[in-house]
Amino acid sequence: MALKTYNPTTPGQRQLVMVDRSALYKGKPVKTLTEGKRGKGGRNNTGRITVRFRGGGHKQAYRNVDFKRGKTDVPAVVERLEYDPNRTAFIALIKYQDGEQAYILAPQRMAVGDTVVAGNYVDVKPGNVMPLGNMPVGTIVHNVEMKIGKGGQLARSAGTYAQIVGRDQDYVILRLNSGEQRLVHGRCRGAIGAVSNPDHMNTSVGKAGRTRWMGRRPHNRGVVMNPIDHPHGGGEGRTSGGRHPVTPWGKPTKGKKTRSNKSTNKFILISRHKRKK
């Protein structure tokens, strides 16, 4: 889908660049596949702010997207493509031969009327799901499981994908968008193709108000705060902080390694950080 620009009648319109969603379904989602979603405003169960600069935003209904695709060897027809406010990718409503409906992530080049199926050995076409070990090397995949039967976790946002670049006994080697290469078990399943809406990265919000509609509040820098509020705060006039960048709680930021999960290091063949050096 193409990008839309607008006549500069206001400063917000001048900057605005949006994805043209005219080809998507314009009605309401399937009620049985949606549920209510209450905004937390960045608070946890004790009422304390755990994520700063969150709150407000437009009311949204959560669409239950099927990341597992557990119905094997039952063909389904794509009924329509829909916008989903909860994610950057588009979603597709599919209807199985037994009449059951489900939402799935829509891959690129999926169209209304297409047939998709999940199974151990299926055609290599966008939207079909099969174990990674049964796919040919070089296949582009998305919504990839990291644990067998858990449901897709990798490559789910707009325009993303992973590529199978090799095999190692029971595992396949996946190259992710970040440049990381990691081992994933061959019995883990993935959907073929790249995720829809690749132009999302080229959009421009246009104005602060649209960011508020998304539930994001203004983000203030530490150097403009008082010393009581942030380690970078205080000083007469504009200062640069005077110390290495830290979080509001004094922990080093901007490049400080925070990964503590050592148990899965053995699955990472090429780190996404090493690639950038």
From Swiss-Prot:
Look up the record and give one Gene Ontology term from the biological process aspect: cytoplasmic translation
Superkingdom of origin organism? Bacteria
Q: Which GO terms describe its molecular function?
A: rRNA binding; structural constituent of ribosome; transferase activity
Q: What is this protein called?
A: Large ribosomal subunit protein uL2
- Lineage, highest ranks first: Bacteria, Pseudomonadati, Pseudomonadota, Alphaproteobacteria, Hyphomicrobiales
Q: Which family does it belong to?
A: Belongs to the universal ribosomal protein uL2 family.
Q: Listed disulfide bonds for this chain?
A: none
**Residue spans of biased composition, Basic residues class:** 209-220
The organism is Nitrobacter winogradskyi (strain ATCC 25391 / DSM 10237 / CIP 104748 / NCIMB 11846 / Nb-255)
